[in-house]
From Swiss-Prot:
A zinc finger (Phorbol-ester/DAG-type) spans 98-144. The gene is Araf. PANTHER family: SERINE/THREONINE-PROTEIN KINASE TNNI3K-RELATED, SERINE_THREONINE-PROTEIN KINASE A-RAF. The active site is at D427. The lineage of its organism: Eukaryota, Metazoa, Chordata, Craniata, Vertebrata. It catalyses: L-seryl-[protein] + ATP = O-phospho-L-seryl-[protein] + ADP + H(+); L-threonyl-[protein] + ATP = O-phospho-L-threonyl-[protein] + ADP + H(+). The modification Phosphothreonine is found at T181, T316. Zn(2+) 1 binds at H99, C125, C128, C144. ATP binds at I314, G315, T316, G317, S318, F319, G320, T321, V322, K334. Residues 19-91 form the RBD domain. Dephosphorylation by the SHOC2-MRAS-PP1c (SMP) complex consisting of SHOC2, GTP-bound M-Ras/MRAS and the catalytic subunit of protein phosphatase 1 (PPP1CA, PPP1CB or PPP1CC); this relieves inactivation and stimulates kinase activity. Binds 2 Zn(2+) ions per subunit. Its EC number is 2.7.11.1. It comes from the Eukaryota. This is Serine/threonine-protein kinase A-Raf.
């Protein structure tokens, strides 16, 4: 029997605390929750269950009245239960085990599942695959859920649930558009869907772990993800029925059948069916491990919209609107202009986020997370300074040549880092370069090929995107399927250098945008180098000319650009402090020779 799910739909805010309720939890644990008016049992026990790796969907709650247990619905109001005792038990059909931890040295690249830091010496559960540092052991869920025995049946049987009353709750039945657009009968259902984590469907049968101490088990399902109790019940029943009908083919001889395992808790040292499998080659195992991810890493970087507060609209660009927001401090939130994203766009966007989340550089805006509901949005650090465009063309800030060259060096350094990560900016311009806390350069709005590409249904269109003044000729012509390259970023960087060395924008004498596009694309128009400052070094002038070459093969790449600017900086004349000792604060006695002072002391 499964208890009713979900709290009552109510728009009222929870009021003050009125009492407490004592709750007995699985694994002989207990807690005390605060009773608040307007809250349900579901809401009150939500945090206590999640920190223990449990979920309301796989548990049932009872009221303890005169020593007898009475089933209670999760949507029952908590206020009338003030002073009573509740008991939470795990559903019988949910296969739970205790952790089986072993000490392990990870010779291959591994990261802790909790602090996400590099892991070399640590511990690993041989049942569910959790790996962690010793100091992270307090964060490990107490209960271990082993889905390896019925995961294959889960995917084959998921289609049979399409006619059930809870079809909309099956993870595999949710389309991407439903995930991206909030919809549902109640606000609470919408809030729960934001935290829902669906199991990734594998292309091949799941690879069971071969008992070894050389590689971690990266394809086990985590216990912290919410699980649907009806799916687990259906899976366990169908698996046990199928195994009995095949007469033992479903499990190796000498090992406990999945049906017997699902009816109770396994021993920590019980053997898995995978132990009887023949060892496969290391190469084949690595291929399968790549196909079967243990957990989508984007799960840790997607931010629920309810946690982000938009404060002020900063501006609107070619690909979205930037807001100042609050999320654990001041952040910049860029809401991207993607109306009704398709499944292909959603997957491409998430793939890009996996690349951007690994960017860490002093000259790059820090990527902090992303959102997919109700639309695409990116969260980055908040930069207090203004953009380079504002300094040069609005505020008319005066920089000396040494400062201009240093800004150019930092910009080249940040772009060199992005290109080393195989990230093409596609929209480098002075508006996307910020001067943070003085003259520290921060490059923003990088990557985002999914958003910066025009789409027609599921296929990208071959149309130029970006700002015209910083657009290379090959990007304007769009003769190649993908004209964006490292060299197209170099051209845009050349235009930024032109702004630094002239203090003005190129083509300011031409008012027609279409005329600029036509003439630059044909090679008839290029920035006027006669406007460069007279004190600009010759090496910088040559570099500027090379970056603005019409043929992209003739443009240098950022490692060469950075080396040129660093060499130029070292060759600039500097006013160095004298190595001699200053004599500004000497007393008159200090100027006397030492021999005279010693002679004076000898006089009686």
């Amino acid at each position: 029997m499964e208890p009713p799910r979900g709290p009552p739909v109510s728009g009222a805010e929870p009021s003050r605390a009125v009492g407490t309720v004592k709750v007995y939890l699985p694994n002989k644990q207990r807690t005390v929750v605060t009773v608040r008016e307007g809250m349900s049992v579901y809401d009150s026990l939500d945090k206590a269950l999640k920190v223990r790796g449990l979920n309301q969907d796989c548990c049932v709650v009872y009221r303890l009245i005169k020593g007898r247990k009475t089933v209670t619905a999760w949507d029952t109001a908590i206020a009338p239960l003030d002073g009573e005792e509740l008991i939470v038990e795990v559903l019988e059909d949910v296969p739970l085990t205790m952790h089986n931890f072993v000490r392990k040295t990870f010779f291959s690249l591994a990261f802790c599942d909790f602090c996400l830091k590099f892991l070399f010496h640590g511990f690993r559960c041989q049942t569910c695959g959790y790996k962690f540092h010793q100091h992270c052991s307090s964060k490990v869920p107490t209960v271990c859920v082993d889905m390896s025995t019925n995961r294959r049946q889960f995917y084959h049987s998921i289609q049979d649930l399409s006619g059930g009353s809870r079809q909309q709750e099956a993870p595999s039945n949710l389309s991407v558009n439903e995930l991206l657009t909030p919809q549902g009968p109640s606000p609470f259902t919408q809030q729960r869907d934001q935290e829902h984590f669906s199991f990734p469907a594998p292309a091949n049968p799941p690879l069971q772990r071969i008992r070894s101490t050389s590689t971690p088990n990266v394809h086990m399902v985590s216990t912290t993800a919410p699980m649907d109790s009806s799916l687990m019940q259906f899976t366990a029943q169908s698996f046990s029925t199928d195994a009995a009908g095949r007469g033992g083919d479903g499990a190796p001889r000498g090992s406990p059948s999945p049906a017997s395992v699902s009816s109770g808790r396994k021993s920590p040292h019980s053997k898995l069916p995978s132990e009887q499998r023949e060892r496969k080659s290391l190469a084949d195992e690595k291929k399968k491990v790549k196909n079967l991810g243990y957990r989508d890493s984007g799960y840790y970087w997607e931010v629920p919209p309810s946690e982000v507060q938009l404060l002020k609209r900063i501006g609107t660009g070619s690909f979205g609107t930037v807001f100042r927001g609050r999320w654990h401090g001041d952040v910049a939130v860029k809401v991207l202009k993607v109306a009704q994203p398709t499944a292909e766009q959603a997957q491409a966007f998430k793939n890009e986020m996996q690349v951007l989340r690994k960017t860490r550089h002093v000259n790059i805006l820090l990527f902090m997370g992303f959102m997919t509901r109700p639309g695409f949005a990116i969260i980055t650090q908040w930069c207090e300074g203004s953009s380079l465009y504002h300094h040069l063309h609005v505020a008319d800030t005066r920089f000396d040549m040494v400062q201009l060259i240093d800004v150019a060096r930092q910009t080249a350094q940040g772009m060199d880092y992005l290109h080393a990560k195989n990230i093409i900016h596609r929209d480098l311009k002075s508006n996307n370069i910020f001067l943070h806390e003085g003259l520290t350069v921060k490059i923003g709005d990088f990557g985002l090929a999914t958003v910066k590409t025009r789409w027609s249904g599921a296929q990208p269109l071959e149309q130029p995107s970006g700002s015209v003044l910083w657009m290379a000729a090959e990007v304007i012509r769009m003769q190649d399927p993908n004209p964006y390259s490292f060299q197209s970023d170099v051209y845009a960087y050349g235009v930024v250098l032109y702004e630094l060395m002239t203090g003005s924008l190129p083509y300011s004498h031409i008012g027609s945008r279409d005329q600029i596009i036509f003439m630059v694309g044909r090679g008839y128009l290029s920035p006027d180098l006669s406007k460069i400052f007279s004190n600009c070094p010759k090496a910088m002038r040559r570099l500027l000319t090379d970056c603005l070459k019409f043929q992209r093969e003739e443009r240098p790449l950022f490692p060469q650009i950075l080396a040129t600017i660093e060499l130029l900086q070292r060759s600039l004349p500097k006013i160095e402090r004298s190595a001699s000792e200053p004599s500004l604060h000497r007393t008159q006695a200090d100027e006397l020779p030492a021999c005279l002072l010693s002679a004076a002391r000898l006089v009686p």
